[in-house]
């Protein structure tokens, strides 16, 4: 079997040299997608789908984070189970892709509007495939164990057939209908959008107070509105039946101030008696709440706004004008006719299109809907059953339940070219009659020009990836998927809709586990966005630091549901870790085996085995719960604190034996395998270079290490280890170097004196037993079973003075940070990320202060 070309460990660590040829090796051998020799051939694989990125550009740092998390999990499962299936793909991203393509065309002064539908579609397709290849190349640079042979695209011919078949099936079952109703309309993109594509933003507006005269009277009601242009479509006026001010007006008529039509005064408890004048105009054609009232009271539904954002013929002399231009002219008209009272500046939530950032207009339109209200109760039972699906972190279940409680039918049609064209047909002579089928019913029929919402096909992604109808056995093995990893901000757009579709079509969940991660924030804890120009290109990070460093930074800061702040220092720390790992590998590789002794294993070796077993079990427990920050830290702490700084250093200062050398290499091999899911490039290269016994052609074909069997008890090395750490800390406190010699006195008998003497010598410490010597002026270092005293006669005044100054500075920082954290206004008004950052800063100051104070106390 093909192996990777060996790399020279003698050279300095360089991420570009380490990564050279590795991706090609993985792609050509595809070892990740071959069953490992230890796996059960009849077992189901660990199956997972890659959230398909949009075809609108390049991968951003958020994609890199999501993919790094998935790859860590997939490689871990490969090492545990031996069989994985991770399907890649891209999303056609209807609105986003079409608008970006058309924007590029306008920049090039190309008139795409002259093209017929087919030409326009094909041009977008060609452009999108170029973008798709860019995304694919970027994904490969991260070193992902994807099954590229099964790559999917949401708008491929196969996907299109699947999506249209589903549409027909759900229509026949009564879950999809076409109805004339009030929808959210994007006047810039000229298409309907769904409720969750409307983003509420605080916006300052003018609240206009306008007179509505009563019929045959000089009396009038004052009505407040932010949208005076919609008065042309008013069909009633409402007051609250409990509002004493307006009792006498019940069931009277008022005159519409713009078109002079008579409209009734009706009553309903929905009316807010605290807002404006507490008299509400009812415009069902342009407001969702008014629309609900119109259904309740069977009112007429009028619309005075066109789909392009201009006013229609109902607006009389303002017909054809842009609604915002018309608004100003209408106010002037009302003022001139003495029907205008005043305006107030108010700030309120206004709905904006998530895609175009224009204010959404509620407009009456005939659209296709998935009637989710028919089955939402079943979905709620499903997501609340942990035997069906587990959500990490669990707190998001409350958010999901709240959304399901307020779920509305899903508008699935869009007025675009780029997408799955709806398979509905209309007779030329009877356009109100519709036939839903994949193929045309005949020459007298024309097809619906609308396409499906992008999220409709995205909701079918787990099925598109596995349900090809050809291999039922493979489908059953992979569906439901083992896991979905995605950001929490698309739970409603995508995750719940996948659950909707899987339940409707398969009466099943689409995945067993749902892992939600947060968002990538900048160094100031702000969300990355184009407007702030604070985005980070992952490819630039890879060029500078390497894919391993980027991946290690991202996964080492990942806790379920939490955001991550981009931090250059942490990337540097990740790169430093890799450099240390390289140097450790080089040291082990260069040990002169001809000088190894025949000494057997001792308490130090028993200790490192116990530590390895503890860490291995702990890491697996954390990985099962997707707590990558904790698992990565536990492994890195073991490698540096236990293996490198204690085990390797003590053996290096003593003398390596054959048994110790073999154990060191065995543990090194094992934690290389355990590190592999986080940093695949460097671990692949080192593994290949070492030529371990029974090694595989690739580290990905290895099995996750089991526990190392050991019959010996821990002996007393924990006490030895703790004493060594305290002596190292003592030397650091007194600014001593490791080579400086110390005398360590003790009175009580020590059962492990042989090993203690041996390993203290490596720290340049002489162990001396005493009987009656006075110890009052010496420094005490206590262990669980003994007291040791350090002989130190040097002047410590300078060290004490330095510590006093440092402690004073830290005390001021603790006080300052504590005042900020405990400030009620700061806690209430500051963004969560900013508050948590200050809290962490305080904790760091307090920890550093304690260390300095402890050091000072030891010197007194």
Swiss-Prot record:
Q: Name one GO molecular function term.
A: valine-tRNA ligase activity
Q: Ligase: is it a keyword of this entry?
A: yes
Q: What EC number(s) does this enzyme carry?
A: 6.1.1.9
| Entry-linked PROSITE patterns | AA_TRNA_LIGASE_I
List the ranges annotated as motif 'HIGH' region.
53-63
Q: List the CDD domains.
A: Anticodon_Ia_Val (cd07962)
* One GO term (biological process): valyl-tRNA aminoacylation
| Reactions it catalyzes | tRNA(Val) + L-valine + ATP = L-valyl-tRNA(Val) + AMP + diphosphate
Q: Write down the InterPro entries for this protein, in alphabetical order.
A: aa-tRNA-synth_I_CS, aa-tRNA-synth_Ia, Anticodon_Ia_Val, M/V/L/I-tRNA-synth_anticd-bd, Rossmann-like_a/b/a_fold, tRNA-bd_arm, tRNAsynth_Ia_anticodon-bd, Val-tRNA_synth_C_sf
What UniProt keywords apply to this chain's record, in alphabetical order?
A: Aminoacyl-tRNA synthetase, ATP-binding, Coiled coil, Cytoplasm, Ligase, Nucleotide-binding, Protein biosynthesis
Say where the protein is mainly found. cytoplasm
Q: Gene Ontology cellular component?
A: cytosol
Q: Which Pfam families match?
A: Anticodon_1, tRNA-synt_1
User: Where's it found, cell-wise?
Assistant: Cytoplasm
Gene3D superfamilies (alphabetical): HUPs (3.40.50.620), Isoleucyl-tRNA Synthetase, Domain 1 (1.10.730.10), Valyl-tRNA synthetase, C-terminal domain (1.10.287.380), Valyl/Leucyl/Isoleucyl-tRNA synthetase, editing domain (3.90.740.10)
Which top EC class applies here?
ligase
Q: Which residues form a coiled coil?
A: 794-860
Entry's free-text remark on domains:
ValRS has two distinct active sites: one for aminoacylation and one for editing. The misactivated threonine is translocated from the active site to the editing site. The C-terminal coiled-coil domain is crucial for aminoacylation activity.
Query: How does it associate, per the subunit comment?
Result: Monomer.
**What's the stated role of this polypeptide?**
Catalyzes the attachment of valine to tRNA(Val). As ValRS can inadvertently accommodate and process structurally similar amino acids such as threonine, to avoid such errors, it has a 'posttransfer' editing activity that hydrolyzes mischarged Thr-tRNA(Val) in a tRNA-dependent manner.
Mind telling me what this protein is named?
A: Valine--tRNA ligase
User: From which organism does this entry originate?
Assistant: Mycoplasmoides gallisepticum (strain R(low / passage 15 / clone 2))
């Amino acid at each position: 079997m093909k192996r990777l070309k060996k790399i020279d460990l003698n050279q300095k660590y360089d991420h570009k040299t380490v990564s050279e040829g590795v991706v090609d090796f993985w792609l050509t051998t595809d070892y990740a997608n071959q069953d490992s020799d230890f796996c059960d051939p009849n077992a189901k694989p660990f199956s997972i789908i890659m959230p398909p990125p949009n075809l609108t550009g390049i991968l951003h740092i958020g994609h890199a984070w999501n993919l790094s998390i998935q790859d860590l999990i997939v490689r871990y499962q490969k090492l545990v189970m031996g069989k994985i299936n991770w399907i890649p793909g891209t999303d056609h991203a209807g609105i986003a892709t079409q608008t970006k393509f058309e924007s590029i065309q306008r920049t090039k002064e190309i008139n795409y509007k002259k093209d017929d539908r087919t030409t326009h579609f094909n041009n977008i397709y060609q452009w999108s495939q170029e973008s798709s290849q860019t995304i694919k190349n970027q994904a490969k640079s991260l070193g992902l164990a994807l099954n590229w042979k099964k790559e999917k695209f949401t708008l491929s011919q196969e996907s299109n057939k699947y999506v249209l078949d589903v549409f027909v099936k759900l229509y026949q079952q009564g879950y999809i209908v076409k109805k004339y109703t009030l929808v959210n309309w994007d006047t810039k993109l000229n298409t309907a959008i769904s409720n969750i594509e409307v983003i509420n933003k605080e916006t300052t507006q003018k609240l206009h107070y306008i007179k509505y005269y009563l019929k045959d009277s000089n009396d009038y009601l004052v009505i407040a509105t932010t949208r005076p242009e919609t008065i042309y479509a008013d069909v009633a006026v409402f007051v609250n039946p409990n509002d004493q001010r307006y009792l006498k007006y019940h069931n009277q008529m008022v005159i519409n101030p713009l078109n002079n039509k008579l409209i009734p005064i009706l009553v309903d408890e929905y009316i807010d008696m605290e807002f404006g004048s507490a008299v509400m105009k009812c415009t069902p054609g342009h407001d969702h709440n008014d629309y609900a009232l119109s259904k309740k009271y069977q009112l007429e539904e009028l619309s005075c706004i066109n789909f392009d954002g201009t006013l229609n013929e109902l607006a009389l002399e303002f017909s054809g004008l842009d609604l915002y231009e018309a608004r100003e002219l209408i106010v002037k008209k009302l003022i001139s006719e003495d029907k205008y009272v005043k305006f107030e500046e108010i700030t309120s939530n206004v709905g904006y299109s998530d895609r175009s950032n224009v204010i959404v207009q509620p407009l009456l339109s005939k659209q296709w809907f998935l009637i989710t209200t028919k089955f939402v109760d079943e979905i709620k039972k499903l997501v609340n059953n942990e035997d069906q699906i587990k959500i990490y972190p669990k707190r998001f279940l409350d958010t999901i339940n709240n959304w399901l409680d307020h779920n509305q039918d899903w508008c699935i049609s869009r007025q675009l070219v780029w997408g799955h064209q709806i398979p509905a047909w209309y007779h030329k002579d009877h356009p109100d009659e519709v036939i839903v089928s994949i193929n045309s019913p005949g020459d007298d029929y024309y097809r619906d020009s609308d396409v499906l919402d992008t999220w409709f096909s995205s909701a079918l992604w787990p099925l598109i990836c596995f349900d090809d109808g050809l291999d039922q056995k493979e489908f059953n093995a992979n569906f439901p998927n083992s896991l979905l990893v995605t950001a929490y901000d698309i739970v409603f757009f995508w995750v719940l809709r996948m659950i909707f579709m899987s339940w409707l079509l398969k009466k099943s969940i689409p995945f067993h586990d749902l892992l939600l991660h947060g968002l990538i924030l900048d160094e100031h804890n702000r969300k990355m966005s184009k407007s702030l120009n604070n985005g980070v290109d992952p490819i630039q990070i890879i060029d500078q630091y390497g894919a391993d460093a980027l991946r290690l930074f991202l996964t080492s800061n990942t806790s379920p549901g939490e955001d991550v702040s981009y931090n250059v220092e942490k990337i540097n720390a990740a790169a430093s870790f890799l450099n240390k790992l390289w140097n450790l590998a080089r040291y082990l590789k260069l040990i002169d085996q001809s000088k190894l002794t025949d000494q057997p294993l001792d308490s130090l070796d028993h200790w490192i085995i116990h530590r390895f077993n503890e860490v291995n079990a702990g890491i697996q427990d954390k990985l099962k719960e997707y707590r990558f920050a904790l698992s990565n830290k536990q492994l890195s702490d073991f490698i540096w604190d236990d293996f490198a700084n204690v085990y390797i250093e003590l053996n290096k200062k003593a003398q390596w034996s054959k048994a110790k050398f073999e154990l060191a290499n065995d543990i090194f091999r094992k934690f290389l395998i355990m590190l592999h899911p986080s940093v695949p490039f460097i671990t692949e290269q080192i593994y290949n270079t070492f030529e371990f016994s029974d090694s595989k052609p690739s580290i990905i074909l290895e099995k996750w290490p089991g526990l190392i069997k050991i019959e010996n008890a821990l002996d007393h090395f924990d006490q030895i280890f703790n004493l060594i750490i305290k002596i190292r800390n003592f030397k650091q406190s007194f600014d001593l170097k490791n080579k400086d010699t110390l005398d360590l006195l003790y009175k009580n008998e020590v059962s492990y004196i042989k090993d203690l003497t041996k390993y203290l010598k490596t720290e340049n410490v002489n162990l001396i037993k005493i009987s009656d010597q006075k110890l009052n002026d010496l420094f005490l270092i206590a262990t669980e079973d003994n007291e040791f005293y350090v002989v130190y006669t040097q002047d410590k005044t300078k060290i004490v003075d330095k510590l006093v100054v440092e402690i004073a500075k830290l005390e001021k920082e603790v006080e300052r940070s504590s005042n900020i954290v405990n400030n009620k206004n700061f806690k209430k008004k500051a963004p969560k990320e900013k508050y948590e950052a200050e809290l962490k800063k305080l904790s760091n100051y307090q920890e550093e202060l304690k260390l300095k104070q402890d050091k000072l106390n030891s010197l007194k």
